[in-house]
Amino acid sequence: MTLLQREENIIRKGNIDKEFSEKIKAAGGDSLEYCFQCGTCTGSCPSGRRTPYRVRQIIRKANVGLKDEIISDPALWMCTTCYSCQERCPRKVKIVDVVKLARNEAAKAGFMAPAHKAVGSFVIKTGHGVPINDATMELRKAVGLGELPPTTHQFPEALEEVQKIIKATGFDQLIGYNWETGELE
């Protein structure tokens, strides 16, 4: 069997989502069409060195409109949004904007990395993606700061406001947060 005979390498018209392609192109501007697949983005990606995340593949699939392939790929969530790819792109493609939009579409379709859901759960519970711990409180005291930063940790009423916003936007449902148990479903 040759490479051209492999079924998974064939792009079929039915796999192309033109609406998704247009959304992606709107997020990345006209620049997305200028990508000539040089690989600078993938070569500069710190996450791509240690994970299966390949920026160039995402951009190529986005250009074609392969929505299902992009949003169902767990590697989509391995981007740290450090902008290394975008800063080095010789064609000025808005790569990170494309990745963010693809993640939004993935989340709406029920594809979200468990680690990202866990961070969302921390935000719901504490108002922070990374809750403060004893070691951090001790370090804050050691450098002359109060144990708690002036955030939801100090102002519980602010956490109530954060939670109202979360409920109003449906973020809790998006990540599968159960208010009764305080856990993800």
UniProtKB/Swiss-Prot annotation:
Where on this chain does [4Fe-4S] cluster 2 bind?
45, 79, 82, 85
Q: Which reaction does it catalyse?
A: coenzyme B + coenzyme M + 2 reduced [2Fe-2S]-[ferredoxin] + 2 H(+) = coenzyme M-coenzyme B heterodisulfide + 2 H2 + 2 oxidized [2Fe-2S]-[ferredoxin]
Key word Ribosomal protein present: no
What is the top-level taxon of the source organism?
Archaea
Q: Does Magnesium show up as a keyword for this record? A: no
Sequence similarity: Belongs to the HdrC family.
Task: Kindly provide the name given to this protein in its UniProt entry.
Answer: H(2):CoB-CoM heterodisulfide,ferredoxin reductase subunit C
